[in-house]
Amino acid sequence: MLNYKKWTQPPNSLIKSIKASRAAYRRLGNSGLLVSNPILGGMHIGDPRWYDWVLDEKDSIALLKAAYDRGINTWDTANIYSNGESERIMGRALRSHNIPRSKVVIMTKCFRAVTDPDVDGDIGSSTAFFPDLTRQSKDYVNHCGLSRASVFQQVEASLRRLNTDYIDVLHIHRFDHHVPPEETMKALHDLVQMNKVRYLGASSMWAHEFAILQHTAEKNNWTKFVSMQNHYNLLYREEEREMIKYCNLTGVGLIPWGPLAAGKLARPPDGKASTFRAINGGAYKDHNPAESEQIARRVHQIAVSRGVPMSHVALAWLNKRVVSPVIGLSSVERMDEVLDARALELSDEEESRLEDPYKAQPPQGHS
């Protein structure tokens, strides 16, 4: 007869593991997959020759190990980050620290072209950001976009760089206007059936484009997207008009990028930016700088009154509305700061103060 009293207390090893897990874990949309909050953004992982704010391999691997040790088990990257070096370093981090593959959720993306080192040896090359030109090149045709040929080629290349058999969540980086939705969604579905990809997601596009792709998958009984990685923070809320409503209604998990607006929501408005990326405000133009400064000042005021960093206030507002933000971290100190943000809850009055100055602006980042 079994002695069930033996199992009335959890083992010490489990308690120890929970104490070390400083991240929270949340369901990704209607899927059963749990992802960490926060998600570690991989754009900072790679080679500083691509952008000056990117960490080199040694510092990148140290950061990834620190993330794993703290329970940040979800790592987001893309094939184009540091022209593939971000993916390679993530794979090396797993091997060098003997991290079991099954204990990390790896997200990557396909759509843009990765610079071919046999064509251009400069890792800082920006081939990815000229999609119309890459379609005219003998070296890049069928190596970008979302055709069946391109999707398969890009995923196989990512698997080699990551040195893994599967990708946990594959995001399409943008919508492809040159390829029928049926071709893209069938290719993605087949990758899932082949167990090379386990879940599908999408990033930054118009809500109607995302709905078209989801409907295409649904009517054909193909794999649907479980996540949307869109641009969303206190300074850019245009996604609230359509995309966020659609995702919430249909069970798609929101994992936004740029949660701290390239650092604008993490330092006082009069503070000095420390990187080229922060100095130039990130990838997109701020159409309402006066309103953005007012919001940032209010974030700072609430942070001072609460005795916490500004990032805690910005993330407390966002975490209430999404599954998990994708955050690019440049140091272990910043990582610990972000992890400590879990404890803060804003009052309704504080949230209203943060939201009131916002002014509508043209949508950005969908192409």
Swiss-Prot record:
Alphabetized InterPro entries for the sequence: AKR_Detox_Biosynth, NADP_OxRdtase_dom, NADP_OxRdtase_dom_sf
Residues reported in the UniProt entry to bind NADP(+): 76, 203-204, 229, 258-268, 330-338
Keyword list, A-Z: NADP, Oxidoreductase, Virulence
Enzyme Commission number(s) from the entry: 1.1.1.-
First-level EC class: oxidoreductase
A single GO molecular function term of this UniProt record: oxidoreductase activity
UniProt record similarity statement: Belongs to the aldo/keto reductase family.
Entry protein name: Aldo-keto reductase AMT2
